[in-house]
UniProtKB/Swiss-Prot annotation:
Protein name (Swiss-Prot/TrEMBL): Glutamate 5-kinase
Function: Catalyzes the transfer of a phosphate group to glutamate to form L-glutamate 5-phosphate.
Stored Gene3D superfamilies: Acetylglutamate kinase-like
Annotated Gene Ontology cellular component terms: cytosol
PANTHER family, per the entry: GLUTAMATE 5-KINASE (PTHR43654:SF3)
Source organism of the structure: Helicobacter hepaticus (strain ATCC 51449 / 3B1)
Keywords attached to this entry: Amino-acid biosynthesis, ATP-binding, Cytoplasm, Kinase, Nucleotide-binding, Proline biosynthesis, Transferase
Listed pathway(s): Amino-acid biosynthesis; L-proline biosynthesis; L-glutamate 5-semialdehyde from L-glutamate: step 1/2
Amino acid sequence: MQKPRIVLKIGSSNLCNGKIIDKTQIKALAQIISELKMRFDVILVSSGAVASGHTTLHIDRNTLQNKQALASIGQPLLMESYREALKDYAIPTAQLLLVWRDFDSRKNTTFAKDTIDTLLAHNALPIINENDTIATDEMVFGDNDRLGAYVTYYFGAKLLIILSDIDGYFDKNPHQYDDAQILPIVHSIPSQALEQTHSPHGDFATGGIVTKLIAADFLLQRKCMMFLSHGRKLDVLRDFLLHNKQSSGTLFCPADSQGIKTLI
């Protein structure tokens, strides 16, 4: 019986501790991936190439040219960290670097999916990142949130898990309101939430949450799901996927779906 396919996306803020790669966090991620692979086919979308490169070459990360250079230095460092952590579980790692045009071309998308299918059939972990070395300011996915959504839909998964530095999607800005509450289940996203100005380094209201909502909206329109939770609280993910218990986080799912039960 074929396992359900899921995509796990982790942001750079959860992979670095200050200016160094957080090996403890990567080991924890490797452990939960090994557990998830007992029940699911897992694809990992990982940010962190630029941040990893910056641990070796301390140059300004805000210019496009420097960002591309740092990504070319950091990507092999990032992959080596994953390879080292996952070898204890006998899980081979594979690298795929993608850009927007890979999804504009049916041919490229098919080739990439065929490669992923083959890797999963042999228990390997496909690790996907945006190809920052050749990406431009006009053609970026946004901290890989939208890349994760595209990978989920085009490569045959039904659930995207985004591990972030927030606990979920709140009913109001938790940095401004002490009574802000996590919304456990969301079936639709208001258009005004998607139209906010966003930047990768903004605050909660105008920063990374917006790209996550755009990713969720993309998937909801295609009858797929997304789960948003904190990347440093992996027991939440473990409870959700392995014990059918939602202790925190937000599940974005179509109103007519049975949620996570469709995968378990």
